[in-house]
Amino acid sequence: MKVLLIGGGAREHAIAMALKKNRSVELYTLMKNKNPGIYGLSKEVSFNNETDIDKIKEFAEKIRPELAIIGPEAPLGVGAADLLTEMGIPTVGPKKLPAQIETSKEFMRNLFKKYNIKGSLKYAAFNEYGENLEKFIDEMTGLGKDVVVKPAGLTGGKGVKVVGEQLKNNDDAKLYAKEVFEKSIGGGKIIVEEKLVGVEFTLHGFVDGENIVFMPAVQDHPHAYNNDEGPITGGMGSYSCSNHKLPFLPDDKLDEAKEIMKETVNAIKAEVGPYNGFLYGQFMLTKDGPKIIEYNARFGDPEAMNLLPILKTDFLDVCFGISNGNLDNINIEFENKATVCKYVVPNGYPICPVKNKEILVNSNEIEKAGAILFYASVNEENGKLVITGSRSAAVTGISERIEDAEKIAQDAIINFEGEIFFRSDIGTKKLIEKRIERMKELI
């Protein structure tokens, strides 16, 4: 069974590992970097830019895969799924128009407004800096609300700035909005939203165009440093619980979030056509219930490293179910295990990360600790592993109890050497209790 995988990060390493549990899978990967984990699982690799449509087509024509899976968001944004589908290849990953649920924040917010989907918030979209933008922010100030400034396009998870975190106040938000337009960050168009107050969580679904099958809820940790301090990153780590819920998230609020995602899938289909792929909702649990912060048209990273290792059902079957609209005939199950994932990242990340420095990985000790190792933004050069400036590698601990899963991950993550750092508090009792207390305060 020939499977084409596009992408070379830790998320794609997790996808590759899940696929290879089925011994019939022959993996062919197109990635820009030599990720040693994916490379070792692949029969053949094409080293090319993951948004190069011509190279994707060339590689697909050469290997003639029976299934294609697109990992990152960037290839989705340039129509990789459209191309592969037109070639007659069953593809996991939404086409360019449905993928706008991630690639265009304006599309997402307008969709919620048009179809009256719950969980939205006050927002406005702007093509230029001017009086209207300033007026909207001033109105938010008058309502006693802080704002969030989001470049409308893709920024690798690092373009969003929030008042009270990266921005001092709403006047500071105006200055950042001006900078976005001047530097054309994320396409030079922005969304200004009211700032939500609460606790974040993520919810994933397998989507086959009609049906959505939900995965366990996960909590990501986007801040760079312990105790949720420092700049926003692509995610420093995440945890999930053995009951597939989260300790601060009531059952009825989880059900509300699921309903929001179901309505979103239906709205996407009505607006631009069916969505076939992984859908990841980033929510804020507020005193008024769950609100959607944003959607991603692919697996979350790091969340993929929590979810895929505990998937009991054959991932290959799930992927075919997604691509052919047949998920309702598959019994998708996850192990009742807790997971904790932690990332090592370059010093200076995400503002000014070191690059092209060697990282040493003691994989034997990581294995002894009982953790799973995932390689991310690294490149294998002349037998050495070099960091490329983004998150470098991740480890996941899995156990019956979250305390034990956290210990496995922590015992493993100390087995890296180089100009790197990590968060030691992810999955700890202290940090989880902080989330619980935060929700009690709000409610």
Curated annotation (Swiss-Prot):
PROSITE patterns: ATP_GRASP, GARS. Mn(2+) 1 binds at residues 282, 294. Its cofactor is Mg(2+); Mn(2+). Mn(2+) 2 binds at residues 294, 296. Keywords: ATP-binding, Ligase, Magnesium, Manganese, Metal-binding, Nucleotide-binding, Purine biosynthesis. Pathway: Purine metabolism; IMP biosynthesis via de novo pathway; N(1)-(5-phospho-D-ribosyl)glycinamide from 5-phospho-alpha-D-ribose 1-diphosphate: step 2/2. ATP binds at residues 140-202. It is an enzyme of class 6 (ligase). Mg(2+) 1 binds at residues 282, 294. GO terms for biological process: 'de novo' IMP biosynthetic process; purine nucleobase biosynthetic process. Residues 109-324 form the ATP-grasp domain. It holds the Pfam family GARS_A. It catalyses: 5-phospho-beta-D-ribosylamine + glycine + ATP = N(1)-(5-phospho-beta-D-ribosyl)glycinamide + ADP + phosphate + H(+). Binds 2 magnesium or manganese ions per subunit. One of its GO terms (molecular function) is metal ion binding. Belongs to the GARS family. This is Phosphoribosylamine--glycine ligase. It comes from Methanococcus vannielii (strain ATCC 35089 / DSM 1224 / JCM 13029 / OCM 148 / SB). The lineage of its organism: Archaea, Methanobacteriati, Methanobacteriota, Methanomada group, Methanococci. The gene is purD.
